[in-house]
Amino acid sequence: MYDADSGKYKRHWGAYGHKPEDTNLGNYDPDAPPAQQFRNPVHCAELAKDGLLYVCDRVNDRIQVFKKDGTFVKEVFIAKRTLGDGSVWDIAFSKDPQQKYLYLADGANEKIYIILRDSMEILTSFGDGGRQPGQFYAVHSIATDSKGNIYTTETYRGQRVQRFLYKGIGTVAKVDQGVLWPRSK
């Protein structure tokens, strides 16, 4: 961590708040106990308004949550059986004052997850692999605007931005919604 005003180094830490090590952890094994260190690359670190820091441990398929001083708070695994590039690529928070929701881009499984931030419960996901609207080709980054719309970008050969319009909050019929196909007005 660096001081935002002065740019001075303050502190750093690894998984679970441990001192980081650069030891090669070998390949990720979803059946093994959770790695006690982050695997490379740690793909995002986002600070919520309440002061909690969310870290995307991409190849370990998990988000770890910390206090600003490095104290470990909790973790959640997302698509834990994802090998290779991992499932936790980027996150964004909803724009309500409490940042009630966390949105996660999973580039390996071509999905966006909507997660209840306080419990880290997955409420729903949408998307699938492909090049049509509503599909993803290595969804890499995610952001939200002041109106609650979600924006995604893709890497490798995806090379596009998609916008998903916020239409309100309602009941979700199933956990995985698949592709959200565009509808005519």
Locations of regions flagged by a protein language model:
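Eukaryotic scaffold repeat domains enriched in small/polar residues
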Residues: 1-185
